[in-house]
């Protein structure tokens, strides 16, 4: 039986790795949303050969608190096939991505239990933000460069301000009158990498303004120089992320281990694989394929939805996509904050923001280069300024190693202000990119539409 084999493999792995867990804070956000599967129900099935398959299906689709959202997946596909209103396709696809993203995180954790902490960490680095990466790739294929930029920027802002702010606020309210301590080592590393990301985003922007002001000149056009600089910075960012992974998985692994869980709710049972290795790989590939389908629907329907809802594409990409697309991970971070496990919460929020900034964004630039799409790191003035202020506020908030609800409120208010900026900002009519796709962000400053 596969279930028995998985449990036996779990016991062997526990004996082989008594201290070095392959679980990261990112995986553990999915663990907080898991629920026990009903083994007794499977045993009642009269046909014995079907029991392993049904147990597998139950673990994948029903052993999560988000199982109620799975019907949105076939509904989104049906809405697209039967040519329903594109707003319905967009909304159902977003809802369907919520449980799929949580299941990808769960399946990554299952595979990591077999492969060990190093390979598991690398797998998490690749699949941890699979939804954002897949949406970015489909947007690049359709030439919607600004959708790529805004969605990735929105994921970073959402993790730094919305997720972290909500977590600190909820944790502070539950622990009213007391401060919640956390280990600063992990947050210091993450914020340093985020400041490097801000520098790499600012360099092409500053170069463009310096050339436009006549203070400096370049051998090619300003756009070509900015593109070359962006690609060079992308290599620097990826090299920094590789160094960060080596630091996290090899030399300083103890800084990133969620020690609070060892004696807490996530007991030893969570260390035993719930699925076999082959099954986990199969379901991971299948879930990724379904995410690709829904991501294509989201990218293809975002502009009609923008017109129908009266919202700019930049607002939907920066605010709505990250909130809904990462809802499972966000909920996990908040749950751990409520349990006074802020180190795991910081690992989820800061880890995801770092992963997107230092891995997904530069990878998107280089993939666009291979595809012949001219995507740079110049996210324009409002976007880059918002990123800088978000990183700066987060760094100051986390500098003393303790938290209370007021810090959460301040982070949330910063997120509201940034969201309001993109709500009122619009692109001048008729602006298009080199591929002919309408963009929501102009080359220079943004304009504000009158109500």
From Swiss-Prot:
Keyword Iron-sulfur belongs to the record: no
Transmembrane regions: 59-79, 87-107, 121-141, 154-174, 192-212, 229-249, 274-294, 318-338, 353-373, 379-399, 405-425
Domain of life where this protein originates: Eukaryota
Assigned GO CC terms: plant-type vacuole membrane
InterPro entries linked to this entry: CaH_exchang (IPR004713), CAX-like (IPR004798), NaCa_Exmemb (IPR004837), NCX_ion-bd_dom_sf (IPR044880)
Comp. bias regions, Basic residues: 13-24
Keyword tags: Antiport, Calcium, Calcium transport, Ion transport, Membrane, Transmembrane, Transmembrane helix, Transport, Vacuole
Tissue: Ubiquitous.
NCBIfam families per the UniProt record, alphabetical: caca2, cax
Name used for this protein in its record: Vacuolar cation/proton exchanger 1a
First-listed, main subcellular location of the protein, grouped into a coarse class: membrane
Entry-linked PANTHER family: VACUOLAR CALCIUM ION TRANSPORTER (PTHR31503), VACUOLAR CATION_PROTON EXCHANGER 3 (PTHR31503:SF1)
GO aspect biological process, one term: calcium ion transmembrane transport
Positions of region (Disordered): 9-37
Organism: Oryza sativa subsp. japonica (Rice)
Cytoplasmic side: 1-58, 108-120, 175-191, 250-273, 339-352, 400-404
């Amino acid at each position: 039986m596969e279930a028995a084999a998985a449990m036996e493999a779990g016991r062997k792995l526990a004996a082989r790795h008594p201290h070095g867990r392959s679980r990261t804070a990112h995986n553990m956000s999915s663990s907080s949303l898991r629920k026990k599967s009903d083994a007794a129900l499977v045993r009642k099935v009269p046909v014995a050969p079907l029991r392993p398959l049904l147990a597998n299906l139950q673990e994948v689709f029903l052993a999560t608190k988000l199982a109620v959202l799975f019907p949105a997946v076939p509904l989104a596909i049906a809405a697209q096939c039967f040519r329903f209103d594109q707003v319905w396709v967009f909304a159902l696809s977003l809802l369907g991505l919520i449980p799929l993203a949580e299941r990808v995180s769960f399946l990554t954790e299952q595979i990591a239990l077999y492969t060990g902490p190093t390979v598991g960490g690398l797998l998490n680095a690749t699949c941890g933000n699979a939804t954002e990466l897949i949406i970015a790739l489909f947007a690049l294929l359709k030439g919607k460069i600004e959708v790529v930029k805004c969605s990735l920027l929105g994921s970073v802002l959402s993790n730094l301000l919305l997720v972290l702010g909500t977590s600190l606020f909820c944790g502070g309210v539950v622990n009213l009158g007391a401060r919640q301590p956390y280990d600063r080592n992990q947050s210091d590393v993450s914020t340093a990498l985020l400041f490097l990301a801000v520098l790499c985003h600012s360099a092409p922007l500053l170069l463009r303004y310096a050339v436009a002001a006549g203070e400096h000149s370049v051998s090619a056009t300003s756009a070509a120089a900015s593109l070359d600089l962006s690609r060079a910075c992308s290599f620097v960012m990826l090299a920094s992320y590789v160094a960060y992974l080596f630091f996290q998985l090899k030399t300083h692994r103890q800084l990133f281990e969620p020690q609070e869980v060892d004696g807490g709710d996530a007991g030893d049972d969570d260390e035993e694989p719930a699925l076999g290795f082959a099954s986990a790989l199969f379901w991971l590939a299948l879930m990724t394929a379904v995410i690709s389908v829904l991501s294509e629907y989201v990218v293809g329907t975002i502009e009609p939805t923008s017109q129908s809802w009266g919202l700019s594409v930049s607002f939907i990409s920066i605010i709505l996509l990250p909130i809904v697309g990462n809802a499972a991970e966000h909920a996990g971070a908040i749950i751990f904050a409520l349990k006074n496990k802020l180190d795991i919460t910081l690992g989820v929020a800061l880890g995801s923001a770092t992963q997107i900034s230092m891995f997904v964004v530069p990878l998107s630039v280089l993939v666009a280069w291979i595809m012949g799409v001219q995507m740079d790191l110049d996210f324009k003035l409002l976007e880059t300024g918002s990123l800088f202020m978000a990183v700066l506020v987060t760094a100051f908030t986390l500098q003393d190693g303790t938290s209370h609800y007021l810090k959460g409120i301040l982070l949330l208010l910063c997120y509201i202000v940034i969201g309001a900026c993109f709500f009122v900002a619009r692109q001048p009519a008729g602006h298009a990119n080199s591929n002919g796709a309408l963009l929501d962000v102009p080359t220079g400053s943004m304009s504000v539409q009158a109500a």
